[in-house]
């Protein structure tokens, strides 16, 4: 996975986006987990779970807080309160 500020993603060797999560600032020191994508051919392999865990680790490492607006993130965090 490639980590950029406010984004984690993976591409295939041709540069096609395979998976992505974005978490831009919505306020000072608060990011919005607003988008999660996994290529249809790769769904069901828990890639989105990995992305959100990586994003949460990055967010915590920066000392930021977060709000989820992405439907997947909202559901995932509700199912994993111990990781939120």
Model feature map: region roles:
Residues 44-56:
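Conserved acetyl-CoA-binding loop-helix of GNAT-fold acetyltransferases
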């Amino acid at each position: 996975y490639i980590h950029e500020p406010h984004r984690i993603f993976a591409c295939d060797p041709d540069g096609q986006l395979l998976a992505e999560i974005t978490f831009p600032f919505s306020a000072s020191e608060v990011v919005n987990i607003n988008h999660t994508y996994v290529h249809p051919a790769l769904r069901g392999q828990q890639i989105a779970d990995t992305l959100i865990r990586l994003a949460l680790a990055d967010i915590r490492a920066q000392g930021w807080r977060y709000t989820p607006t992405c439907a997947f993130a909202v559901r995932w965090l509700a199912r994993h309160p111990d990781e939120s």
